[in-house]
Amino acid sequence: MAERLSPADIEAQLANLPGWKQVGDRLEQTFTFKDFLGSIAFVNRLVDPAEQAGHHPDLSISWNRVTVCLTTHDVGGITQKDIDLAKVISNLAVV
């Protein structure tokens, strides 16, 4: 089982994750795209990496925005799994 990261570890990791912030026990970022098709294309790109990691983000989709929330439910907080998936998601957003 993954271990919860300490507040200091989370802060240090967020320094390398531009745009991501800690909101309670989760990481969150809102990505903005040209239009709805861009938003949906981004969400579709998330599917395979999330499945491969066995770790699935909570998503909120609006016309040209996708808010991604990451937390590790079984430990009730942020783990390295969340940090790792946040890095992958950030890279997918710049395609």
From Swiss-Prot:
Superkingdom of the source species: Bacteria
EC number(s) from the headed UniProt entry: 4.2.1.96
InterPro entries xref list: PCD_sf, Pterin_deHydtase
GO MF, any single term: 4-alpha-hydroxytetrahydrobiopterin dehydratase activity
Annotated keywords: Lyase
Biological process annotations from GO: tetrahydrobiopterin biosynthetic process
Reactions this protein catalyses: (4aS,6R)-4a-hydroxy-L-erythro-5,6,7,8-tetrahydrobiopterin = (6R)-L-erythro-6,7-dihydrobiopterin + H2O
Similarity-based family: Belongs to the pterin-4-alpha-carbinolamine dehydratase family.
Protein name as catalogued: Putative pterin-4-alpha-carbinolamine dehydratase
Record organism: Thermosynechococcus vestitus (strain NIES-2133 / IAM M-273 / BP-1)
